[in-house]
Design a protein with these regions (language model features):
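Bacterial N-terminal signal peptides
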Residues: 17-26
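C-terminal regions of proteins
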Residues: 278-321
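Active-site environment of divalent metal-dependent phosphoester hydrolases
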Residues: 147-148, 276-279
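Aspartyl protease catalytic domain
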Residues: 112-263, 267
Length: 321
């Protein structure tokens, strides 16, 4: 019995020593290198388990997130994110405000106005509604009135005004990608087409402004209020990385608008509408109820309803893919 008692006491002392050593090792008390593996853990033969926690899956909003315009300047800075990635940037050069869109994250949608082109079998009508509204990032004006002879208009296989060869054309394909070029001169490709909006000739081609931007202002680039050369103007371009660039200004000549686009990286561009009543762009902040609109162009007059209510003229929306 005494031998058994002594054995039990020795066993208890050995256990206490092991526990104490383990505690010291956990506190770094065994003199091992900082952050290193404790020698005791290796001796005990237990599996070394790294303190690893799986990161929780990140959940992104189901709508584009607008970060605000910030201070406008020549450097591009993010204004819209989609699923945590930058989908739109903003910059301003020589008074020309530009929005640049990543077509991998967003797509362009051509809307028919209630008067221009008017009622018809259009998939996208005179206001942004339903699921499109929930995915809305931006919207802006389209081109001249269709009765001015500036070009054709087509959507969903239906033609409001016949397309004209050589006209600057904003072509959106059914896969959601958009290209800009002269009709039947490089575009369209063989892909199925969703919509085409034509307006005048290319303002920018191969990164160079049209030769007429200084010499043929009203005849080539549209009649202005009071025959002024410097008025509100807008355009849509595309850069070498297939990003779309909307450009607008409350006061510019065609040459100034073209140069702003070129400085922003545009390779090709079509002029859109001009004069202050018809040049407008918005970003949209999502919350409860109707999206809140954020005017993009300093000094813009804006349009009634901000494209969230029926509008008479056609326009473009930028929506999350």
């Amino acid at each position: 019995m005494r031998a058994d008692g002594r054995a039990r006491r020795k066993g208890r002392r050995a256990g206490l020593i092991v526990l104490a050593a383990t505690a010291l090792a956990g506190c770094g008390g065994l003199g091992g290198p900082a952050g290193g593996t404790s020698p005791l853990r290796t001796v005990t033969g237990g599996p070394a388990r790294a303190a690893h926690r799986s990161r929780p899956k990140r959940h992104y909003p189901s709508f584009p997130v607008v970060n605000g315009l910030g201070t406008l300047g020549p450097r591009w800075h993010p204004v819209v994110t989609v699923r945590g990635q930058t989908a739109a940037w903003i910059a301003q050069r020589d008074g020309v405000t530009m929005l640049r869109f990543d077509q991998r994250l967003v797509r362009l949608v051509l809307h028919a106005g209630s008067a221009d082109p008017g009622s018809g079998p259009w998939q996208y009508g005179d206001t942004i509604r339903g699921s499109e509204r929930r995915r809305l990032a931006a919207a802006f004006n389209a081109g001249f009135k269709l009765d001015t002879g500036a070009g054709g208009w087509q959507s969903g296989g239906h033609v409001a005004v016949p397309l004209t060869a050589g006209r600057a054309s904003i072509v959106t394909y059914r896969d959601g990608t958009t290209d800009i070029g002269a009709w039947q001169h490089g575009i369209p490709t063989s892909q199925p087409i969703a919509s085409v909006r034509q307006n005048l000739s290319l303002l920018v081609d191969n990164g160079v402004a049209a030769a007429t931007v200084n010499s043929c202002i009203e005849t080539c680039w549209g009649a202005t209020i009071g025959n002024a050369a410097t008025v509100a103007r807008s355009a849509l371009g595309i850069d070498a990385n297939r990003r779309l660039i909307y450009a607008a200004t409350p006061s510019a000549t065609p040459a100034t608008l073209a140069q702003g686009l070129i400085d922003g990286g545009a390779q090709r561009a079509a002029e859109l509408d001009i004069n202050p009543d018809w040049v407008a762009a918005y970003l949209y902040h999502h919350g409860r109820g109707l999206p809140e609109f954020l005017p993009v162009i300093p000094g813009q007059y804006g349009v009634a309803g901000h494209f969230l209510a029926p509008y008479t003229r056609d326009f473009f929306a930028i929506v999350e893919r």
